[in-house]
Swiss-Prot record:
The protein's name in its UniProt record: Endoribonuclease YbeY
Species: Cutibacterium acnes (strain DSM 16379 / KPA171202)
Keyword annotations: Cytoplasm, Endonuclease, Hydrolase, Metal-binding, Nuclease, Ribosome biogenesis, rRNA processing, Zinc
Subcellular location: Cytoplasm
Protein task: Single strand-specific metallo-endoribonuclease involved in late-stage 70S ribosome quality control and in maturation of the 3' terminus of the 16S rRNA.
Record's cofactor remark: Binds 1 zinc ion.
Signal sequence annotation: none
Length: 155
């Protein structure tokens, strides 16, 4: 189950984010009964979370708060089910950095949603090798999502 809450006061493509999260969880072979929360917040709230949980000043674009320790299964394993956790996005920060990254605001939000989801599944980018794996997987999921929308006329 995917729950999305917009506390940001900014318009957002919530339906699109839920669709992408559903698609990504299926692609990553996470059981469809797993629970994920997506929370959209304003800059002030994101800044408070960033400082409280990361010890860093200023707002950021995305934070992930894992619940159950889950990983994508191997080919011969059953999909895991449980509480994935929360992904917190800040639409105003996302919109500002979208142009820097050559994306639309919706495209940036989608990219960051997958980034946050991968963190919930144990991926990280502290080391160069981890970063390559995580960012490659992020790009692959977004490309597959774009293809899916193209094929189903959702673009």
């Amino acid at each position: 189950m995917i729950d999305i809450t917009n506390e940001s006061g900014s318009p957002s493509n919530e339906e699109g984010l839920v669709g992408l999260a559903t698609f990504a969880l299926d692609r990553l072979r996470i059981h469809p009964s797993s629970e994920l929360s997506i929370i959209l917040v304003d800059e002030e709230t994101m800044e408070a979370y960033h400082e409280k949980f990361m010890g860093l000043p200023g707002p950021t674009d995305v934070l992930s708060f894992p619940m159950d320790e889950m990983r994508a299964p191997g080919d011969d394993e059953d999909p895991p089910s449980g509480l994935l956790g929360d992904i917190v996005l800040c639409p105003t920060v996302t919109a500002r950095q979208a142009a820097e990254n050559g994306r639309t605001p919706d495209g940036e939000a989608e990219y960051l949603l997958i980034h946050g989801l991968l963190h919930l599944l144990g991926h990280d980018h502290a080391e160069p090798g981890e970063k390559r794996v995580m960012f490659r997987l992020n790009d692959e999921i977004i490309a597959a999502w774009d293809d899916h929308r193209e094929q189903t006329g959702q673009r």
